[in-house]
């Protein structure tokens, strides 16, 4: 087990004690949220900016992700809590949402897949940053679920660390409002550009 202070030890002691309940929660397709709510409370006692995500991977390993939900001030505590964690058989710990090649999300009536998004971007190579506009196929400005879905798509496809470190501004548009002279790229192409040109 790595060395960590009493605040971090308190969180990880709770996690180890409740490991079986967390595994049962993941295996049950997250039907009873009580243990997840306890986990959220424990993590926010450590730092109020942090949020937990629980899932399983294709190899049957349980995954615990800590995310600051795009808030830069949460980067340091996210890193600290994950790096202070113990080794637990059958578990992997991740700081930030990891980039995926495939991802979709449904929030109320907003159902979004990678193919439903085009990206406008303005790279600033000198300052290693990029401004982006997320363009949805059926975007409605009055429906805030589109923006929530957009930020989650960015975190999960482009990668939360890339978003925190390299994306300066995010805006939203409908496909119908994309200027004809502007070139659009996919979310996957955006991730590639950021990783190849801005680091």
Regions found by a protein language model. Give the residues of each.
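Long, contiguous binding/interaction regions
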Residues: 1-61, 69-199
């Amino acid at each position: 087990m790595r060395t960590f202070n009493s605040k971090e030890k308190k969180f990880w002691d709770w996690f180890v004690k409740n490991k079986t309940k967390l595994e049962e929660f993941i295996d049950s397709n997250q039907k009873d949220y009580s243990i997840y709510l306890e986990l959220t409370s424990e993590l926010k006692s450590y730092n109020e900016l942090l949020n937990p995500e629980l899932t399983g991977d294709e190899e049957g390993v349980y995954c615990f992700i800590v995310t600051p939900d795009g808030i830069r001030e949460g980067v340091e505590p996210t890193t600290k809590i994950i790096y202070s964690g113990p080794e637990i058989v059958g578990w992997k710990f991740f700081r930030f949402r990891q980039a995926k090649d495939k991802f979709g999300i449904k929030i109320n009536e907003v159902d979004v897949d990678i193919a439903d998004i085009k990206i406008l971007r303005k790279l600033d190579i000198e300052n290693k940053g990029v401004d982006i506009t997320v363009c949805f196929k059926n975007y409605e400005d009055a429906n805030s679920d589109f923006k929530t879905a957009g930020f989650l798509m960015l975190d999960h496809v482009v990668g939360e660390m890339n978003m925190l470190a390299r994306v300066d501004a995010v805006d939203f548009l409908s496909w119908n409002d994309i200027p004809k002279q502007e070139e659009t790229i996919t979310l996957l192409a955006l991730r590639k550009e950021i990783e190849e040109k801005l680091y």
